[in-house]
Structures are given as structure tokens and as C-alpha cells.
């Protein structure tokens, strides 16, 4: 009996330990918040109470609860919140910046790998490594009829892959991303000097990158090192894919198109880490072995097209990573989605690998092409026909895609294929999954429901329902494509952007809001109604008129600046294109005080000879004073005739300033010479005294 009780207590303790471990594992990673304000991106590690074992206590009798008024210093709390929000914002911005800046480096890496494939000595060595029997099979296949060739090509390619796997071995880690290390280095960069332990841990993580990325081979001598790997028939799985690419190019006869595909291992800005410090200190995130078995999918694979056999047929070959024969050589159509290459997005099972883009490069023409829709789902937003008012244009995902597209144009130095773009668009717009929760709708750039529209957003009149969303309370709401959402702005906002509302344009929405100034003084009654318009309801702001008509209908040229003065005593010019003819803008600078020069000039002049100017408001500063829009005055407006006079004053002032500096320098030199002549050189006198 005692033995049974002892065993049961031990089992209970073990179960409690396992439950604690499971809790910790679940709370390590979270998806990033969708709010663009970046208010909370990681939770405080000391505030996590999930690991506390709560004890049940029976309550006999009454329970008295006393509420106390806890006074907190508002200014201190506000200062802490501002500091925390600023740190969180910088943390998220840095993660996104790393994601963007890695794109060109990864594209250059793909182009450099393709240059190795053209090396003649490397081709000769790999070609000779193929047995004559395999070469004979490919030659016999080449002379058969097209129907037989089309049916047997996959079998032939599969045999070549199996031979390659049995003869070429993996001996080191390939290219990979490490979420834990990057998150730690970003998040605790400012905290490494708190104590000696934090400093040593941070330094160790920074310098010992092989623990987090593996022991990758050093390629100091370029293709010469690759030749040595081919000679030993040992490399990492990325280089081995290049070897198979070269072998396939040399063995497969006839016209063909070979592409090297690369899933860009970019930094994932959509995930946040709650306990990254604890994980680093406990060795979580280190590479387990040199075979990269923790990486679910490959980063490099091959696409093959044989136009003479079948137009639109595509063979996708992975000679290294996949275990199933179907995934090793997959026969499909070029307009079909391939789901087997997208890593799992479940953060419990996969955090070390996730890719947003797949880019391929042609062996013959060395042209880079984006083939992401073939392998990555839910990228419809990249191929939407968007209006200028679409909020998708400002999303992080779409901005990242535009950045990739720009670099592809730069590296290709020519326009992308229209046919290829049409195929990718067709795949993208048909390969999507409907969101199942409100959180998923908030995260996606493809869909939206009316209840999640912002106060300055509205659906197009022609918007069509894509599906129906069922909420938790069994109520239903229509799902629309996010491309049908229009972002609206007020008249003042459009004016700042250099656009004016079209005549007879009716507001698409009216927004009721409480100005910040009224909120600060707790005046909750003075609401303001703003009319909101779309981009399509605006036009470029016209120029200020340069003429006016008097009461007799005669037209006169405007020469008086007071004609443009508003009630605040200035003129609003947000774009140089709206500047009235006959007048010029003079930028204000710290070097020369233009306004002071004009005032000094006007002192001795008659009224008709004086230079008149008008302050120009070119925008507003909303951060200088909370709740206020402080106008930015960075230039003044003067008549064209006065413009030349002001420029002459500026030139004369600069000359006088230069001469005054020379005068000061010469006076100092004269004083120095006089002191030396009368009292001698102080340094020489001290040396003379020391000698005596």
C-alpha cells in the first residue's frame, strides 16, 4: 500500500513537471499584432504568472475584501509608457528593416551561385562522375518517340536522383535563418551592459554564430573551393543541389529550360518572442546537427521544362531534402499550385523555416523571376489591381513585395515576361484559404468584413461578396476582397498632399470625432464632423490665380501679396506647382536670416520701393505640441522683381560674413605677433629656464 502511494505521488510530480514544460513551450512564440501603432510587441517576462501552482483553499465562514486606493504618479506612468512604446516601435521597425535589407543580398547570392554552374572544370568533373549506364539510358530515351519520352521522363529523373543521393553525401549545414538569435540580438542590444552576465551572454551569442547557423564551409577562393567539394562528393544540401543541376544539364539531351529556385530565407517580422532571453540561456535555438534535419523544406530546388514534349508541363526536382519519391520528382503544370514546398506555419512545430518569396533564375539567360504564387499560398494581394486609395498599398506585406519587384527589375535590366506574370497572377488569385476567425481576417491582406473597416475606410459601390463569415455567436457577416476597400481623407489632408476636391463631389463618408485639444481639456461636447473623400474625387491642386477681375469686369495682373493672405496672415503652398505666376519662393536657412535682411533693407526705402513678403506654410508638425498642428514655415513668397534684389542681398551678406571671418583671423594673428614681440614666445622661455 505504501509502495503504491509512493509511486502515485511520484507520477503526480512527474505529470506536474510535464505540464509546466508544456506551458512554457506554448508561450514561447506568438504572431505579431496587426495594429500598425506597434504599441505592444512583446510581453514582460517577469509578469508571466502561467507557471505558478495555485493551491485550493477551502473558505469557512465569511470573507472580507478591502479595496484600497492605490495612488500612482501619472507623470511617471506616462513616461514609462512612452519609453516602452518607443522601444517596442523601434524593435518592430528594426525587424522589418532587416527583412527588407536582406532581399538584395539573397538575390545577389542566387546570381553568384548560378555563375558557379558555368565553370567548365566543375562541369567536366561532375559529368565524368555519372556512370556510363545512366548516360546510355538518357541517350536511348532521346531517340524514342515523343509519347514514350513524355511518359518515361519522370522515371528517368527519379532514377538519377536516387543515384545522386547514394553517391553524394552531406557533411555540413546549408543556408538557414535563426529566429531566436536574431530576436535576442535585436531585443537585448541596449541591455547587454546591465551586468557582467548579460554582457558575456550577449557577446557569446554574437561571436559564436556557428552554434546557431551550423558549421558551414568557408568559400574563400570562390569556385575553386566548390571544385574541391565536387571532388570529395561531399557538401551541404544547397551546394549539392547545384551539383545535381550541373549533372542534369550535362546528362539530359535535347532542348530544355532549367531553373534554379531559391526560397529566400528572410527575417520573419510577423512573429514575436516572449521568452527569448530564457531560451538563449537554456540553449534553445541551436542547430541540432549538420544534416539540417530540423529544416522541413529545402531552400534550393530545380524546375525543368521540356517545350518539345509538352507545352506547359513542369518537373519540380528536389535531389536532397524530401523523402517521398513523389516529392523528389513532381510532374505538374506550370499554372498549378504546389503545396509540398511551403513549410508548416504552426509555431509549435516549425519556427526555424518560413519563406515569403521564391525566386528562380534561368540557366541560359540568367533572368530572375518571382515564382512565389506557385509555392506560397494567400498572396492574392500582390496581384490585385489597386486604386490609389487602397489601404493595401501601405501594408507591410505589399511594401515588401514592391521592394522585391524593384530589385528584380534592377538585376534583370529588362521588363518582366508578360506571359509569366499572367501565369503567376492566375495561380495567386485561385490559391487562397478563407479566414476562419476575426484574428485571421485582421492579419490577412486579402479579405475584410464591414465591421473591421476603419473610420476612414469604405467599400466600393461595386464591391461583390466573396464569402460569408460566421462569428462565435452564430451571426453571419459578408466577406469582401480587401481590394474593394477605399481609404478616405479630409479636404485639409488632401490639400497637404497637393490635391483639391473636384467640383460637385459628394463626401463618401462623414466622420464624427473629438479634436485632441478638446479631449485634453475634458470637453466632450464639441464634436467635429469631417467630410471624407477618395483619391478619385480629387485632382491636382490648381495654381493660385495670377489675375483678378474688377467690378467693371476688367482683368488685372495681381502684384500685391496681400491678395493671397489668409486669415492667419500667410499663404498655404503644399506643392511648388500651385505657386502663382509672377512670384517666387525663397527658402529660409539658418546661415542667413532672410527676413532680417529684408527688414534692414526696407528701413531706408520708400513704401513703393520696399520688399514685401508672405510666409509660406508647406505643412504641419503634429508632434511638436500634443493636440496641435503647428504650421511649418520653411520659405517666403516674394514678387519676381523683388526676388533678384533678395538674392543680391544674400550674396552680399555671405561676402561680408566671409570678410568678417578673415578680419577676426587677421586680428588674432596680429595680437599673437605683438605678444610674441613684446614678451617673447612663452614655450621657448620655459625651455630656456629649464636649461638653466
UniProtKB/Swiss-Prot annotation:
UniProt keyword DNA repair, yes or no: yes
Residue spans crossing the bilayer: none
Subcellular location field: Nucleus
Family as reported in the entry's similarity comment: Belongs to the XPC family.
Summary of the function given for this chain in its UniProt record: Involved in nucleotide excision repair (NER) of damaged ribosomal DNA (rDNA). Required for the repair of the RNA polymerase I-transcribed strand of rDNA.
Superkingdom classification of source: Eukaryota
Example of a GO cellular component annotation carried by this entry: nucleus
Primary site of residence: nucleus
Gene Ontology molecular-function annotations: damaged DNA binding; single-stranded DNA binding
Keywords: DNA damage, DNA repair, Nucleus
Organism the protein comes from: Saccharomyces cerevisiae (strain ATCC 204508 / S288c) (Baker's yeast)
Protein name as catalogued: DNA repair protein RAD34
GO terms of biological process kind: mismatch repair; nucleotide-excision repair
Misc note: Present with 78 molecules/cell in log phase SD medium.
Keyword DNA damage attached: yes
Record region (Disordered): 1-38
Acidic residues composition bias: residue spans: 28-38
